[in-house]
């Protein structure tokens, strides 16, 4: 879907965006904005591991895309003063690929595996003893001459990241000593992130301009930084050269991001739900066909934020509009029909 690829408020990274993000990532936990419960716990775990001169336990970071899982993995390595090796689940095709990564780690190093839920079963089998016993069990040769070889590994920390924790197998999930869910950010936290990013990028921005971008960023720092870069373009070419609330509002409306943080895809879904199905309930497949999108696109991309904002209900009979749905679309919600009594 071409529209999906260019969606301004998707939490997934765009082509080349990770390189732009690198300069904006904080290095230390104290610089990381938001995720206060996770930061508090990690501070304890990191200090305890350093006091014992041990590698910190394996960590699973899970949550929607764009919330800072990769950044957190880098911070963990930086705080521990160790090296970081990064890869992703789909890249590790064979057990040998994983073995090569593990045998090249130094004591205490962090191995970061993004999209860890996409590891193949064969690779997972190799990972189990590596995580638990810090050993590799490899088969050398084939047929009758094949033999098992155990290779000792340095104590390392595996940091896995996933947007779908439910797709992890139980044996893999159970081997993580620290499970951490990353939550969506509050607008004031995103305002701090936008202000910090603007300072690094040399952008002149007012407090209300930063908040205007923050409150439309769907609780996601990656989206906030992306919108900041695009609003900067409007300020540079069609504005006064700095970002205030008025310019941010005009630029974001031009980018089809409304004052609720909804874009064209969100509007299409809500419009179909209200106009074609009278607010629902309607089955997911029927709704997907009505807006020309795949079922998975609605479930994974469009729905989560609408549900978070109370603009969509999942019911046993299908998707249903809420009072907030009508308000967001500038409609008046119908009054609930009251059933009469028999008496």
From Swiss-Prot:
Gene3D superfamilies: 1.10.8.60, P-loop containing nucleotide triphosphate hydrolases, Winged helix-like DNA-binding domain superfamily/Winged helix DNA-binding domain
Annotated region (Disordered), positions in chain: 1-20
Region (Small ATPAse domain (RuvB-S)): 186-256
Keywords, comma-separated and alphabetical: ATP-binding, Cytoplasm, DNA damage, DNA recombination, DNA repair, DNA-binding, Hydrolase, Nucleotide-binding
EC number(s) reported in the record: 3.6.4.-
The protein's name: Holliday junction branch migration complex subunit RuvB
Protein family membership: Belongs to the RuvB family.
Record's subunit section: Homohexamer. Forms an RuvA(8)-RuvB(12)-Holliday junction (HJ) complex. HJ DNA is sandwiched between 2 RuvA tetramers; dsDNA enters through RuvA and exits via RuvB. An RuvB hexamer assembles on each DNA strand where it exits the tetramer. Each RuvB hexamer is contacted by two RuvA subunits (via domain III) on 2 adjacent RuvB subunits; this complex drives branch migration. In the full resolvosome a probable DNA-RuvA(4)-RuvB(12)-RuvC(2) complex forms which resolves the HJ.
Subcellular location: Cytoplasm
Binding site for Mg(2+): 70
Organism: Magnetococcus marinus (strain ATCC BAA-1437 / JCM 17883 / MC-1)
Region (Head domain (RuvB-H)): 259-343
């Amino acid at each position: 879907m071409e529209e999906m690829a260019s969606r301004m408020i998707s939490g997934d990274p765009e082509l080349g965006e990770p390189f732009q993000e690198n300069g904006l990532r904080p290095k230390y936990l104290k610089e990381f904005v938001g995720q206060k419960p996770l930061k508090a716990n990690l501070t304890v775990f990191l200090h305890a591991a350093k006091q014992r001169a041990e590698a910190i336990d394996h960590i699973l970071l899970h949550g929607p895309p764009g919330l800072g899982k990769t950044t957190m993995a880098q911070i963990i390595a930086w705080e521990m003063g160790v090296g970081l090796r990064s890869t992703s689940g789909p890249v590790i095709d064979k057990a040998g690929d994983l073995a090569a990564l593990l045998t090249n780690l130094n004591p205490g190093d962090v191995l970061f595996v993004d999209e860890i839920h996409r590891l193949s079963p064969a690779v997972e089998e190799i990972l189990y003893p590596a995580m638990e016993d810090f050993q590799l069990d490899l088969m050398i040769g084939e047929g009758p001459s094949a033999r098992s070889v155990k290779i000792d590994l340095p104590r390392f920390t595996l940091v896995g990241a996933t947007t779908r924790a439910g797709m992890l197998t139980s044996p893999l999930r159970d081997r993580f000593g620290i499970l951490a869910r990353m939550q969506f950010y509050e607008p004031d936290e995103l305002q701090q992130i936008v202000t910090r990013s603007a300072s690094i990028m040399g952008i002149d921005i007012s407090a209300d301009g930063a908040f205007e971008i923050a409150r439309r960023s769907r609780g996601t720092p990656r989206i906030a930084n992306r919108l900041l870069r695009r609003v900067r373009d409007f300020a540079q070419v069609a504005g006064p050269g700095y970002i205030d609330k008025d310019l941010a509002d005009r630029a974001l409306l031009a980018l089809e991001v409304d004052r609720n943080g909804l874009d064209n895809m969100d509007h299409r879904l809500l419009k179909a739900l209200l106009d074609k199905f009278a607010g629902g309930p309607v089955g997911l497949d029927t709704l997907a066909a009505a807006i020309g999108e795949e079922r998975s696109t609605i479930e994974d991309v469009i729905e989560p934020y609408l549900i978070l904002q109370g603009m969509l209900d999942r019911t046993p009979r299908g998707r249903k509009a809420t009072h907030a749905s009508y308000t967001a679309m500038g409609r008046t919600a119908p009054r609930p029909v009251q059933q009469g009594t028999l008496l």
